[in-house]
Curated annotation (Swiss-Prot):
Protein name in the entry: Large ribosomal subunit protein bL21
GO molecular function per UniProt: rRNA binding; structural constituent of ribosome
Keywords, sorted A to Z: Ribonucleoprotein, Ribosomal protein, RNA-binding, rRNA-binding
Function: This protein binds to 23S rRNA in the presence of protein L20.
Keyword flag RNA-binding: yes
PANTHER family documented for this protein: 50S RIBOSOMAL PROTEIN L21 (PTHR21349), LARGE RIBOSOMAL SUBUNIT PROTEIN BL21M (PTHR21349:SF0)
Length: 103
């Protein structure tokens, strides 16, 4: 059984027990998170697709850790002027384990 959920502006295919990294969600380690935006569920050959979401379907996950993504460097430069600026960014992410998929 697997489901497709929408979180953080992205779609993720998940199954029970999967470890998933998503955009930062509020909460701390051990907290439970419920996803109500379930776009599709497949169970034993039967596929149910929502328009746009499935009513009554939910996916429950548990937060494993709050982490940061890889460092991204941004470099700005003006030609012939000697101006340049280098900045960095690390995206806040949440790592979670999927506990339950229900229809």
């Amino acid at each position: 059984m697997y489901a497709v959920i929408k979180t953080g502006g992205k779609q993720h295919r998940v199954s029970e027990g999967d470890l998933l990294t998503v955009e930062k969600l509020a909460g701390s380690k051990g907290d439970s998170v419920v996803f109500d935006d379930v776009l599709m569920v497949a169970k034993e050959g039967e596929i149910r697709v929502g328009k746009p979401v499935l009513e009554g379907a939910k996916v429950v996950g548990e937060i494993v850790a709050q982490v940061k993504g890889p460092k991204i460097y941004v470099f700005h430069m003006k030609k012939r002027k000697g101006f340049h600026k280098k900045t960095g960014h690390r995206q806040q992410l949440t790592r979670m384990r999927i506990k339950e998929i229900s229809i």
